[in-house]
Structures are given as C-alpha cells and as structure tokens.
Amino acid sequence: MTTRAHIDGVVASGFNDVRTEFERNFAERGDIGAAVAAYWRGEKVVDLWGGRRTPEGDQPWNKDTMVVVNSTTKGLAAMTLAVANARGWLDYDAPVARYWPEFAQNGKAAITVRQLLDHEAGLVLLDEKLTIEKLRDLDAVARVLARQTPAWTPGTRHGYHTMTLGLYMQEIVRHVDPAHRTLGRFFHDEIATPLGLEFYIGLPRDIPGERLATLKTLSAARGLLALRYTPPAVTLKMITPGSLLRRSFAGLAADPNDRRYLEVEVPAGNGVGTARAMARAYSAFAEGGAELGITPETFARVTAPPEVARPRDEVLGVPSYFSLGFLRPGPNVSFGSSPRALGAPGAGGSFAFADPDARLGYAYVMNKLDFYLEDDPREKALRDAVYRAIARHRPERRHSISQSTAPLRSAGISVART
C-alpha cells in the first residue's frame, strides 16, 4: 500500500491547480520530497512543500527544508554580477583582464565579461582537478583558472560551462567589489539579506543537518536508463569519454550530499536554499530589480533577448541560449511569456526563473534527481498550472509559451490556507 505524501503550504485563490499538480507529482510522477513557489506582481501566490526530505525514512520535508539545487545556482550567481554592473563596478563589455590581470594568460586577454557569461569563452575544462580542500583556498583556485587555456577561440562559438562558470564569476566579484567579498558573501549581504532569503552559496556551518534534504542520486543503471529522456545529441556527448561534456565534469567531482562540499563556494552548482527564496529573488528581478538597486539600464541589458549567431552548443550538442549568466528561452527550452524571461535549471529537475512581462518569479526544487535536459514533467506541470492561473485572472490575455504577452494588470488575490 502506498502512503500518501504529506502536502503543506499556501496557494492564492485561483491557483489551486498548482496544488493539484503538486500532489500528482508524488502520486504519479515519482517525487520523494519537493517544494514549489511563485510570486506574481510581487505577491506570493504559491508556496507548497511536501513529501520526505530523505529518500529513505519518514522525515518530512518541512517549510524550512533546504536542498542543493545544482546548476540552478548559476542564476543566483548571475544576479550578483547584475548588482555589480548597476553599481558601476563592472562593465559587461570590458575584458575580464581589466579587473583581473592574471586572467590574460594563455590567450585570454581579449575575453570580455559578456563572452564569459554567455558561455563563449571556451573555458569549459580544468587542467587541474579541484578538490574540496583546494576549493577552500580561493587564491589557489584563481591561479588554476588564470592558467587555463580556452578549448576554442573565444567568441567564435559557445558551449555550456558546466562547473567552471561560477568559479570565474567568483573571481570577477572578488576583484570588482571594493570590499573584495566572495561571491557567496556578496550574495548574502546584497541580495539574500535585503530580501530575507534562505539561500546560501557556501552553506554556513551552523545550519543544522536536519534542515537539509538528501538527494536521491542516479545509480549507473538508472543513469543509463534515464538517458532515454535526453536528446540523442546530448546522450552521445554523455557516453563519449573524450567529449567536452564528459571532460567538463572531471575537474570538479563532488558528492552533493557531502556537507563539506556544500560549505565551500561553487557558484555554478552548490547553492542551498528553498524554492520560496529563489522565487522571491526572481520576483525582485521580474519587478525590474529596484529592490536590489538594479538600474533601468542594467535591467534592460540583462533582459535583452540574446544574440546567438550559432545556436548549437559545443558542449551539449543541441541549441542553447545564454545571456549574461542566465539561460534564456529557445526552441528546445521554452519558458516564460516572452524572450525577456531568464533563469537557470539544475541537474535533476530544479528550475527557477523570472518572467518580467508576466511579472512572475517561480522556483521548483526536489530531492529525487531525474534526467531531463529540459521540461522535467514534474516541474513543467507546475509551471503550466501557474500560467493557467494567471491567464484566468486576465482571460483576454491568455498565456502562450511561444508568444510574447503584454504585462498583466493588477488583480486582487487573497491567500488561502490549504
């Protein structure tokens, strides 16, 4: 007999379908523990959590349960650079070496911040493996990064910088911040604290382990079986030992359930927090970023549709669209109501994004890893339910994933306990 998963939280009136799909994720789609949150027009309209925080046992996923979100961290890291740009500390079109002279080694002198954040720099590999011990020494990590040679001529193509992007963003922040804070500290001080977020890039040691969800990772057998969900080109890259995709993971191998790994800063992949926190952060962006000191000029830069001359991703083997550190909508990754949407997915199924035209901030997190490159059925069911609810509040402007919509007008929404 299957035990029904506990579900708790709140939804606004009109958003009950999100709760229904959340329940179906446990009953039909295999979720173990998860949470979903959405803010619309600056107000919380969905905040649900449920299931178990560990794959085995009966410890419940509670309101304050946090989980590592893998590459969904990249979007939060990119927000820190947007704040730096708004403050005049960072020019996206300047060479990285202007701020970090040592970066210019081995053919990298002309690489701009934009090229790096757009995954065009060719810095997808690490010639030296970074252990947890080395990751604690950021100066040592910086020397490794500075010595790296690009895998292709920078600016001529693009490819997903799986684990390295966050490490390079770390060094940019450390060099442009007048206080030389780490990216994790900068995020905490300038984004998390002002917004009241429980999200960390570098987990504090005083966070009790009982608050952390444990990931159910893929075994080798399940991993091979799960490849049927990925595009054939990506599958080929994953099973080819010498591919850039396979090699991109070799420089930084860590167990996402290892507390030591969570306590160092890996801004491309080890952020820990709640869906509520990420949805709130993206809501601030969806509202224009004023809460974070984002200027209209920076907001326009960050939300401008990406210019991708060659959509094929050299690492993934399929088209991808990135701009200034964020994933953007494309033919094979459709989210948001217009090309201005921005966010970041994470390995296993987590996803968070901002939709400025709909004024929506959204996030989904879970502890059971699946292997969809995009549109994990669990997450997409929730996302679609959110947009259906928004459309019902404004029937004459129904949402279409592939069609831009105008900003939605204010609607009175009362929050009801469920």
Where are these regions (language model features)?
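Short, gly/Ser/Thr-rich active-site loops of penicillin-recognizing serine hydrolases
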Residues: 266, 287-290, 303-311, 372-418
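Short, compositionally biased leader-like segments
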Residues: 1-15, 318, 324
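Active-site Gly/Thr loop motif
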Residues: 217-275, 304-357, 393-397, 402
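Short, well-ordered beta-strand elements
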Residues: 44-48, 352-353, 359-368
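Active-site helix/loop module of the DD-peptidase/beta-lactamase fold
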Residues: 63, 68-72, 86-128, 146-147, ...
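Flexible glycine/proline-enriched surface loops and loop-helix/loop-strand junctions
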Residues: 62, 148-155, 166-170, 258-267
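Alpha-helical scaffold elements that line and support the substrate/ligand-binding pocket
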Residues: 42-43, 68-89, 116, 161-191, ...
